[in-house]
């Protein structure tokens, strides 16, 4: 009798602990499954998830409800984590925001995401996800923002998207999605998004949708009437019938239609069967066995607590381990870095609130790296802007980083040339911690997008020559006319933005990498003993990589002429491929982009000559390049031997028909 009583008591206590710990046994377990699916975490952002006794609400990227009983937000963006999306994420049913933007997530989007009925923001953009968009996303009845841009998603849009009547932002650009966005209904005004065998009326979706981007996929058909209020750039780079859009080439569209979409081997059947087996297994257990398991589990838990107490005791008595590159908050307060207050007196300072309004709550992301995010926005006066936001935490910000940030702002503010992006201002705030740069926005996208994602034929030979000379003039200005000189951190076609009339603008969006690298290099100069660290007048200035810029310009010239990227998995490096054409003048025409109908042989020879001179330099050693042509000489060669008459006419008009008329 007594044993039965104790068993019942143990059962009641066990059930009490289980019910009190419902948060831990459900949502925390799902978070741990997500952590297990991440196999690389180079920045150690999830390192504090490993402590079994820590509060999940204190884990990096986890935000809980005010009562701390549910997870309502997961934000681990731009953290370089590699892995899969665990299906168990669908068990965190109180989740309102799932933001995993800018990582290296692979595999498919699990259908279990559709279980998150409270989700308002789903941001999986800029990853390596594949396969179709699961139809279960249509079950996210309260969703307001979906961002799946810049992945490898395939298939057609699921018809169930028509159920999302509160969706106001949809970003699915830069994937490999196919199918039609619209089939006109009987009235001519109803729009339908088609899945494989069904369609759904998205009239409600059209009413709610304020921002959308379908560009650079393989969609066909026409733009839905209810989406005609969106910018035309939201549909460019597809295979649609609208003549006023920049389309993919006919060969790309034809190939896309021939390729059958085979999703990655889905693990759903196996996963589903495993769930059914587990469910059956649980249902078949007798009650006495369940009670025994609870008692055993409690005893194991007690032993774990004793072991944990012992480990904590030993940890508190451990010898101190000093990590040289980490400083505690108390150590950070021991020194101060004095910065010249006059340094930024002539540069406009904008508030975070101003930029938040201009960039629509920082939702319009146009670029991302491990160090920064780039947003597009519009100021009150109507000026379009590109805002670079540094991805760094306040506790990681040092006096040296602050100095380098201000020097970078002052350096960029010096630039004033037709072929360099203009810095409009900066943002610096403490709460929330913010460091941003604000540039004028070139509305025609990057050179890389035009050459490799858009309709390359629209960038005719005349326009390409105009871009070549514009880049050369920009580099000449930066290297030769500025005092002190200025170099682009990573010169590539992604760093060349184009205006409506195809004027190139050199932009240094990768300057953060230089700032962080130089800060770490100088960190050893900070004395932990002294109370003040005064920066010497001779402190190193902006790192000048003139030879690297000129070498990169040579690669750019080949990329512009050929339409090929610097590296392609199937065809290798552009430089290696181009060698045979550069060394044999009679075969030089083989370099030219096949998308071009016309080109000028003399211009081609000039560009190839300059490219060869650039590539013959040593990009790692400025001292070995004294006898090589300077950027001024290279620019003069291009300007004197390439006719600018066509480019001059094109400059007065940004319409494509003007160029076509000149070509004919």
Swiss-Prot record:
The keyword Transcription regulation does not apply. InterPro entries: Kinase-like_dom_sf, Leu-rich_rpt, LRR_dom_sf, LRR_N_plant-typ, Prot_kinase_dom, Ser-Thr/Tyr_kinase_cat_dom. One of its GO terms (cellular component) is plasma membrane. It holds the Pfam family PK_Tyr_Ser-Thr. PROSITE patterns: PROTEIN_KINASE_DOM (PS50011). Residues 360-642 form the Protein kinase domain. Glycans are attached at residues 75, 197. Residues 310-664 are cytoplasmic. Its EC number is 2.7.11.1. It is a single-pass type I membrane protein. The chain crosses the membrane at residues 289-309. This is Probable LRR receptor-like serine/threonine-protein kinase At1g63430.
């Amino acid at each position: 009798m007594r044993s039965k009583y104790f068993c019942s008591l143990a059962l009641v206590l066990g059930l009490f602990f289980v019910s009190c710990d419902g948060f831990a046994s459900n949502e925390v377990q799902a978070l741990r499954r997500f952590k297990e699916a991440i196999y690389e975490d180079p920045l150690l952002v999830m390192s504090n998830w490993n402590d079994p006794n820590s509060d999940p609400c204190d884990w990096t990227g986890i935000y809980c409800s005010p009562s701390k009983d549910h997870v309502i937000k997961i934000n681990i963006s731009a953290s370089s984590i590699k892995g899969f999306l665990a299906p168990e994420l669908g068990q965190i049913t109180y989740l309102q925001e799932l933001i995993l933007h800018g990582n290296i997530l692979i595999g498919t989007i699990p259908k279990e995401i559709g279980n998150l009925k409270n989700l308002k923001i789903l941001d999986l953009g800029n990853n390596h996800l594949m396969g179709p968009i699961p139809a279960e996303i249509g079950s996210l009845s309260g969703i307001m923002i979906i961002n799946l841009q810049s992945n490898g998603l395939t298939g057609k849009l699921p018809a169930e998207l028509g159920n999302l009547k509160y969706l106001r932002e949809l970003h699915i650009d830069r994937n490999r999605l196919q199918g039609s966005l619209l089939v006109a209904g009987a009235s001519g005004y109803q729009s339908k998004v088609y899945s494989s065998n069904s369609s759904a009326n998205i009239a409600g979706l059209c009413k709610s949708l304020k921002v959308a981007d379908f560009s650079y996929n393989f969609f066909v058909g026409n733009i839905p009437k209810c989406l005609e209020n969106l910018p035309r750039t939201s549909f460019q780079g597809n295979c649609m019938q609208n003549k006023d859009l920049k389309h993919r080439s006919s060969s790309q569209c034809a190939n896309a239609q021939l390729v059958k979409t085979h999703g990655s081997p889905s693990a759903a059947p196996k996963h589903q069967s495993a769930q059914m087996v587990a469910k059956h297994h649980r249902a078949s257990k007798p009650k006495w066995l369940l009670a025994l398991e609870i008692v055993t589990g409690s005893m194991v838990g007690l032993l774990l607590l004793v072991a944990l107490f012992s480990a904590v005791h030993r940890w508190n008595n451990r010898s101190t381990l000093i990590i040289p590159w980490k400083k505690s908050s108390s150590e950070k307060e021991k020194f101060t870095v004095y910065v010249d207050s006059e340094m930024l007196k002539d540069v406009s300072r904008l508030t975070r609130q101003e930029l938040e309004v201009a960039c629509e709550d920082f939702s319009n992301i146009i670029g991302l790296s491990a160090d920064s995010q780039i947003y597009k926005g519009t100021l009150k006066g109507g000026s379009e802007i590109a805002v670079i936001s540094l991805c760094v935490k306040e506790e990681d910000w040092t006096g040296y980083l602050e100095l380098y940030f201000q020097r970078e702002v002052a350096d960029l503010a010096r630039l004033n040339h037709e072929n360099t992006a203009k810095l409009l201002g900066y943002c610096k705030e403490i709460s929330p911690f913010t460091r941003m740069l604000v540039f004028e926005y070139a509305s025609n996208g990057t050179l890389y997008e035009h050459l490799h994602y858009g309709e390359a034929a629209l960038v005719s030979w005349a326009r390409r020559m105009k871009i070549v000379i514009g880049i050369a003039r920009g580099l000449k200005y930066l290297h030769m006319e500025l005092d002190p000189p200025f170099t682009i951190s990573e010169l590539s076609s992604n760093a060349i933005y184009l205006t409506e009339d195809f004027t190139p603008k050199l932009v240094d969006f990768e300057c953060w990498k230089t700032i962080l690298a130089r800060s770490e290099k100088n960190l050893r100069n900070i004395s932990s003993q002294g109370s003040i660290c005064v920066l010497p007048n001779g402190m190193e200035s902006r790192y000048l990589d003139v030879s690297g810029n000129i070498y990169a310009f040579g690669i750019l010239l080949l990329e512009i002429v050929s339409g090929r990227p610097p590296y392609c998995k199937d065809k290798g490096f552009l430089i290696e491929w181009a060698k045979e054409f550069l060394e044999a003048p009679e075969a030089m025409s083989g370099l030219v982009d096949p998308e071009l109908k016309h080109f000028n042989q003399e211009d081609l020879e000039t560009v190839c000559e300059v490219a060869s001179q650039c590539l013959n330099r040593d990009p790692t050693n400025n001292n070995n390049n004294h006898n090589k042509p300077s950027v001024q000489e290279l620019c003069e060669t291009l300007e004197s031997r390439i006719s600018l008459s066509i480019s001059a006419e094109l400059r007065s008009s940004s319409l494509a028909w003007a160029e076509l008329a000149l070509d004919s």
